[in-house]
C-alpha cells in the first residue's frame, strides 16, 4: 500500500477515534467530537435503558426470570459460565501444564528435533499463535502438529475420522502420536497423563512423544519457548528472528496486559456473558481497547505493532482480529463496529500480516473458524446456522468497503 494511501487511512482513523456519530457502525466524521471511550460507555448505557427483547425490557422481572432459568441448568463441558454464577462473567481457566523445553544441562525436556508434537485447533485463536511462531521460526521439521476437528461437543475437541469430509485443512487427521491410535478426543491425551485431571481439555497442547506426557498447554509460554529454544539447530535466517527482543520487553509486556484482557479475552467475556450487565461491561471494555489499539497504530506508523519489527504482540493480536468480522461481530455480539469499516488501521494491519506473511495466512482456516463457533456454541446459536458473510472473509490489500472508499475520496 503506497504512502499516500496509508496517510489517507491514518486521517480516516484519526477522525473515527475522535467521534462515533451514530448508533450503528459508523465510519465518518460528525460535527461533534467526543472521545471514543466516553462514546462507547454512553452508548451502552443508553441501549441498556431502552433495549427490549420480544417487547420485554431486558431488565424486566420476566427477563430476569428467564435468566434464572438458564443458570439453574446442570454444568456441562460447554458451559462457559458456571451455572449458578449470578455475575454472568466468563472466567478463563488457568492452564495446568507449565513445563518448558529448555537448553539447560539435565533439563527434563531438552530441545530434541522430532521429539515434540503440537495439538491444535485451527478454530482456536490461542492455538493459532503457536502455529504462527512454529512457521515463522522454520520449526516444521522440529515439531510435528495435528489439528482436531472444528466441532466441540460434550466431550470437548474431537479428532477427525477418515470419514469426515467437512473439516479440510493441513494435518486435520486422527491422533498421529504412536500409542494414541484409538483416541477419539483430546481429553484422552489429558487423561493419559493425569487420570484425575479435572480441568478443561484445551488446545494448544505441546506433547513429549518420548516420555508420553504433556509439556505445556499455555499458548503464551509455548510461543515464547519456541522463539529461541531451537536456535542452535536452526539456519541463521531463522535463528536470528527474535519476537521478544530485549529493548522492547517492557513495552511488549505492557501491551500484552491490556490487549489480552480487553481484546483477546474481551471477545469471549462479551460473547459468553449470561447477564446483560456482564455483556455491557465487557463489550464496552473491548471497544475501548480496540480504539486504543487503533490510536497506537496511528502513532507508530506500522506495519507492525512496534513499527518495523515483528514481535509477540503481532502474533498474539492477529488471531483475534482475523476472527473479528467473520465471527465475533455476529456470534459474540461484538457489533458496535466491525474491523473493516470501523478501524481502518487495524484493518490494514491485519491484512498486511495475512497477505504478506505465509505464517499468518497459512495458519488461518476460515472454514474451521466459522463452523466451530457457530456449530459448537449451541447455547448461543441453538440451530447451528452459520452466516454466509462477510464476503470475502478478508479483503485484498488494496480493496476497501464502500464507506472507506468514500472517506478516502474526501
Predicted regions and their residues:
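C-terminal alpha-helical interaction module
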Residues: 1-410
Amino acid at each position: 500500500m503506497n504512502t499516500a494511501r496509508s496517510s489517507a487511512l491514518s486521517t480516516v482513523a484519526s477522525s473515527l477515534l475522535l467521534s462515533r456519530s451514530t448508533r450503528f457502525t459508523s465510519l465518518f466524521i460528525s460535527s461533534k467530537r467526543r472521545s471514543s471511550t466516553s462514546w462507547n460507555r454512553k452508548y451502552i448505557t443508553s441501549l441498556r435503558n431502552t433495549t427490549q427483547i420480544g417487547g420485554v425490557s431486558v431488565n424486566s422481572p420476566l427477563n430476569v426470570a428467564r435468566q434464572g432459568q438458564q443458570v439453574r441448568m446442570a454444568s456441562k463441558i460447554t458451559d462457559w459460565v458456571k451455572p449458578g454464577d449470578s455475575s454472568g462473567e466468563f472466567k478463563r481457566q488457568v492452564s495446568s501444564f507449565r513445563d518448558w523445553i529448555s537448553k539447560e544441562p539435565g533439563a527434563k525436556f531438552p530441545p530434541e528435533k522430532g521429539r515434540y508434537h503440537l495439538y491444535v485447533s485451527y478454530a482456536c485463536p490461542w492455538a493459532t499463535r503457536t502455529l504462527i511462531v512454529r512457521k515463522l521460526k522454520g520449526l516444521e521439521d522440529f515439531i510435528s502438529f495435528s489439528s482436531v476437528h472444528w466441532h466441540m461437543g460434550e466431550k470437548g475437541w474431537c479428532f477427525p475420522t477418515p470419514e469426515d469430509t467437512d473439516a479440510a485443512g493441513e494435518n486435520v487427521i486422527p491422533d498421529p502420536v504412536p500409542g494414541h491410535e484409538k483416541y477419539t478426543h483430546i481429553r484422552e491425551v489429558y487423561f493419559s497423563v493425569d487420570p484425575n485431571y479435572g480441568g478443561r481439555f484445551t488446545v494448544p497442547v505441546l506433547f513429549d512423544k518420548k516420555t508420553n506426557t504433556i509439556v505445556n498447554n499455555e499458548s503464551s509460554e509455548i510461543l515464547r519457548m519456541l522463539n529461541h529454544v531451537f536456535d542452535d539447530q536452526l539456519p541463521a535466517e531463522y535463528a536470528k528472528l527474535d519476537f521478544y527482543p530485549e529493548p522492547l520487553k517492557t513495552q511488549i509486556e505492557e501491551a500484552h496486559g491490556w490487549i489480552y484482557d480487553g481484546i483477546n479475552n474481551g471477545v469471549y467475556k462479551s460473547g459468553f456473558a449470561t447477564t446483560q450487565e456482564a455483556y455491557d461491561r465487557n463489550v464496552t471494555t473491548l471497544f475501548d481497547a480496540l480504539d486504543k489499539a487503533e490510536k497506537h497504530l496511528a502513532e507508530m506508523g506500522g506495519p507492525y505493532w512496534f513499527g518495523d519489527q515483528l514481535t509477540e504482540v503481532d502474533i498474539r493480536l492477529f488471531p483475534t482480529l482475523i476472527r473479528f468480522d467473520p465471527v465475533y461481530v455476529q456470534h459474540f455480539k461484538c457489533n458496535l463496529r466491525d474491523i473493516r469499516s470501523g478501524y481502518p488501521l487495524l484493518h490494514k494491519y491485519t491484512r498486511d500480516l495475512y497477505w504478506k506473511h505465509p505464517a499468518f495466512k497459512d495458519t488461518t482456516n476460515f472454514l474451521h473458524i466459522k463452523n466451530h463457533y457457530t456449530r459448537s456454541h449451541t447455547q448461543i446459536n441453538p440451530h447451528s446456522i452459520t452466516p454466509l458473510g462477510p464476503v470475502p472473509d478478508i479483503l485484498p490489500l488494496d480493496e476497501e468497503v464502500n464507506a472507506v472508499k468514500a472517506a478516502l475520496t474526501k
